């Protein structure tokens, strides 16, 4: 069955578990292979400036061994940009980054910092890498991204994932409205952050959604059922949305 919504699996937290003992296992490269077997359409990994989980060696091995699309998540930092341009993943996702944060806490401020981001985008484009931006579902940010002519925008779904009660529908509407802006501007619509097996279907059902990137919930589930099955379960959820829409 065709995968009308692509599933990108973020394997960062396999590396987080490895780093808890500063050892060699679990191996995120093996996890990526198992995710592919479970139905992942892409593998996402974030090489942070502090190298808290994914390592430079991991990045090299992902690009060399992953058979589906590779999605290199990074900040606009010169050394990491240079690594990305050298290893040439299929996609680069630019995100904000703070050493104090536990995980990415919000989208890029493209509207307020377009110069630095534009320079990073140009470097990536010159290297032949498709580019996307991680943005909050705010119209001014989408308008700024459209001017930079990126290939995709990944909407930050964290506020939706944390919402309760009536706020859930409010956040879904924000995602749907800005998603339409993204598609109308000719960019590919992606989304991610905080999505799990309970809350993913309404986001997957947003008109024109092309790709969801999901990490922590899949890695958490994999502790119980294995990576291949954890990814397959998420794949079935996304496929059920596609079937319902037909």
From Swiss-Prot:
EC number, UniProt record: 2.6.99.2
Residues binding 3-amino-2-oxopropyl phosphate: 10, 21, 194, 215-216
Broadest EC class assigned to this enzyme: transferase
Similarity comment text for this entry: Belongs to the PNP synthase family.
This protein's UniProt keywords: Cytoplasm, Pyridoxine biosynthesis, Transferase
PANTHER family documented for this protein: PYRIDOXINE 5'-PHOSPHATE SYNTHASE
Subunit structure: Homooctamer; tetramer of dimers.
One annotated GO molecular function: pyridoxine 5'-phosphate synthase activity
Protein name as annotated: Pyridoxine 5'-phosphate synthase
Active-site residues annotated for this sequence: 46, 73, 193
Task performed by this protein: Catalyzes the complicated ring closure reaction between the two acyclic compounds 1-deoxy-D-xylulose-5-phosphate (DXP) and 3-amino-2-oxopropyl phosphate (1-amino-acetone-3-phosphate or AAP) to form pyridoxine 5'-phosphate (PNP) and inorganic phosphate.
Site (Transition state stabilizer): 154
High-level lineage: Bacteria, Pseudomonadati, Planctomycetota, Planctomycetia, Pirellulales
Gene: pdxJ
Record field: catalytic activity: 3-amino-2-oxopropyl phosphate + 1-deoxy-D-xylulose 5-phosphate = pyridoxine 5'-phosphate + phosphate + 2 H2O + H(+)
Recorded GO CC terms: cytosol
């Amino acid at each position: 069955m065709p995968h009308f919504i692509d599933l990108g699996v973020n394997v960062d937290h396999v590396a987080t578990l490895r780093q808890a003992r500063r050892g060699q296992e679990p191996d995120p490269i093996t996890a990526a292979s198992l995710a592919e077997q479970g139905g992942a359409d892409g593998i996402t990994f974030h090489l942070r400036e502090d190298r808290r989980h994914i390592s430079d060696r991991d990045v090299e091995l992902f690009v060399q061994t992953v058979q589906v699309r590779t999605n290199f998540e990074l900040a606009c930092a010169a050394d990491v940009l240079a690594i990305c341009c050298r290893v040439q993943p299929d996609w680069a996702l630019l995100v904000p980054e703070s050493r104090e944060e536990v995980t990415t806490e919000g989208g890029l401020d493209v509207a307020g910092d377009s110069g630095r981001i534009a320079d990073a985008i140009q470097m990536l484009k010159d290297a032949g890498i498709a580019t996307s931006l991680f943005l909050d579902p705010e119209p001014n940010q989408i308008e700024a991204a459209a001017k930079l002519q990126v290939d995709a925008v990944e909407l930050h779904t964290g506020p939706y994932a944390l919402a309760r009660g009536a706020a859930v529908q409010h956040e879904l509407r924000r995602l749907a409205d800005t998603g339409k802006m993204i598609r109308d501007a000719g960019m590919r619509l992606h989304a991610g952050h905080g999505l799990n097996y309970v809350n993913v279907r309404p986001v997957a059902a947003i008109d024109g959604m092309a790709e969801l990137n999901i990490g922590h919930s899949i890695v958490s589930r994999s502790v119980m059922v294995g990576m291949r099955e954890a990814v397959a379960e998420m794949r079935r959820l996304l496929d059920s949305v596609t079937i319902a829409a037909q």
